[in-house]
């Protein structure tokens, strides 16, 4: 199975072309913000929200081809704090309002997990 993780905004063309050309099933997971995310800037800023999701490490972009056993990491190293991305969405910021101490711990854990995930993907791409 060909697998790719992309967003509506970034690198989707390459992922979809590879998926279409692959002989067999393909899975393309695409980040697409919706109104239920509670984007504080409003739905008119969805393009920026997708960019921030990638820049913060919340959503890493990659492609994997089973035919070549090649894993391609399309994301660059995160350039913004995950917390800065998460506080821009009501689905996350509401936790901070309701349970500030828990939120602080959970946001720190999420930041650590996002960094570890990116490093894991980076190592995998470099080991090719």
Model regions and ranges:
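Thiamine diphosphate
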Residues: 3-6, 104-128
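General beta-strand structural signal in soluble alpha/beta enzymes
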Residues: 2-4, 29-30
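Active-site glycine- and acidic-residue-rich loops that bind
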Residues: 5-13
């Amino acid at each position: 199975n060909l697998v790719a993780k992309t967003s509506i905004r970034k690198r989707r063309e390459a992922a979809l072309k590879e998926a279409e050309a692959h002989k067999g099933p393909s899975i393309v997971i695409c980040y697409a913000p919706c109104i239920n995310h509670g984007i504080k800037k409003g739905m008119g800023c969805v393009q920026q929200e997708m960019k921030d999701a990638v820049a913060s490490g919340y959503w890493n972009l990659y492609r994997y081809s089973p035919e070549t056993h090649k894993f391609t990491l399309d994301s660059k190293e995160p350039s913004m704090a995950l917390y800065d991305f998460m506080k821009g969405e009501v689905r996350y910021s509401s936790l901070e309002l309701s349970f500030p101490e828990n939120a602080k711990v959970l946001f720190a854990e999420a930041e650590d997990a996002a960094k570890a995930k990116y490093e894991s993907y980076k190592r995998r791409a470099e080991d090719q």
